[in-house]
Design a protein with these regions (language model features):
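Bacterial N-terminal signal peptides
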Residues: 5-15
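Sec/Tat signal peptide C-region and signal peptidase I cleavage site
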Residues: 16-20
C-alpha cells in the first residue's frame, strides 16, 4: 500500500509539473506571437524594409495575397520596399492576433488580421472594403532557433468584401 501511495504521489507531481510547463509554454507562445505582430506593424508603419525582413528567417517563404511565392528574407523585405514605394506608400497598418496555436516547443502558428488604411490603389484580386482600406488574414508559422522566434512560413489572404 505504501508503494502505491508513493506511485500516486509521483504521478500527481509529474502531472502538476507538466501542466505548469504547458502553461509556461503557452504564455511564451502568446508573447512571441504578440511581439512578432507588433514588430510587423511597427516596421510597416515606418516603411522599414530591413526591420520588416528581420521578422523572417533567411530561409522563410511568403505566399502573398495574389498567390505569388516569395522565397527568402531578402526577397520578402524587397517586395515590401517595392510596395511602400508604390500603392502602399503612406499606408498605415493595424493588426489583431486572432489565434495562437503551439505545434511543439519550437513551432507556433499565429493567425492575425490586418487593416491597411491610406491605400493609394487596391491590388488586383481585392474587393472594395471601404475607401482606401485593405483587410487581410495572415497565417504565420513561427520557428524558434537559438532562443529567437521568427517567421518560417507565411500566407496572406485578402478578406472578401461584405
Amino acid at each position: 500500500m505504501k508503494n502505491l501511495c508513493l506511485v500516486l504521489v509521483a504521478i500527481t507531481a509529474t502531472s502538476l509539473t507538466l501542466n505548469a510547463q504547458n502553461a509556461a509554454s503557452d504564455a511564451e507562445a502568446k508573447a512571441a506571437a504578440e511581439a512578432t505582430v507588433r514588430s510587423f506593424v511597427d516596421s510597416w508603419n515606418r516603411a522599414d524594409g530591413a526591420s520588416y525582413g528581420e521578422n523572417y528567417w533567411p530561409d522563410a517563404e511568403l505566399v502573398n495575397p495574389s498567390g505569388e511565392i516569395v522565397d527568402g528574407r531578402a526577397a520578402i523585405a524587397q517586395e515590401h520596399v517595392d510596395l511602400w514605394a508604390g500603392i502602399f506608400k503612406g499606408s498605415r497598418m493595424a493588426a489583431k492576433v486572432r489565434k495562437v496555436q503551439r505545434l511543439d516547443p519550437n513551432h507556433i502558428i499565429v493567425d492575425f488580421d490586418t487593416e491597411l488604411s491610406n491605400v493609394r490603389e487596391l491590388p488586383p484580386g481585392n474587393q472594395n472594403q471601404g475607401k482606401n482600406v485593405l483587410r487581410t488574414h495572415l497565417k504565420h508559422v513561427l520557428e524558434k532557433r537559438n532562443g529567437q522566434w521568427k517567421v518560417l512560413s507565411a500566407q496572406n489572404t485578402f478578406i472578401a468584401g461584405k
